[in-house]
């Protein structure tokens, strides 16, 4: 019985700590830049490459296919 009470109190305490942290971050007091959203879509700022152009990932190409052998958009 005592162990159950201790576990319940511990869980409630940890939940309260999580909620307090969430409220602090939602007020815009971010400590890390990675937690903040830039508000812009990366895809809108980037131009897609045409067929035969150099690519490193499928997302670089218009048709979403980057040939790994030649590193060129197809």
From Swiss-Prot:
InterPro entries: Conotoxin. Keywords: Acetylcholine receptor inhibiting toxin, Disulfide bond, Neurotoxin, Postsynaptic neurotoxin, Secreted, Signal, Toxin. It is found in: Secreted. May contain 2 intrachain disulfide bonds and probably one interchain disulfide bond forming the homodimer. The disulfide pairing is not important for activity towards the different nAChR subtypes, since this peptide without disulfide bond or with different disulfide bonds shows the same activity. Expressed by the venom duct. One of its GO terms (molecular function) is acetylcholine receptor inhibitor activity. Belongs to the conotoxin O1 superfamily. This is O-conotoxin GeXXXIA. It comes from Conus generalis (General cone). The lineage of its organism: Eukaryota, Metazoa, Spiralia, Lophotrochozoa, Mollusca.
């Amino acid at each position: 019985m005592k162990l159950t009470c201790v576990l319940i109190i511990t869980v409630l305490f940890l939940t309260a700590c999580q909620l307090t942290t969430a409220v602090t971050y939602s007020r815009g007091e971010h400590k890390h830049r990675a937690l903040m959203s830039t508000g812009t879509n990366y895809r809108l700022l980037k131009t897609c490459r045409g067929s035969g152009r150099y690519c490193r990932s499928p997302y670089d190409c218009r048709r979403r296919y980057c040939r790994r052998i030649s590193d060129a958009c197809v």
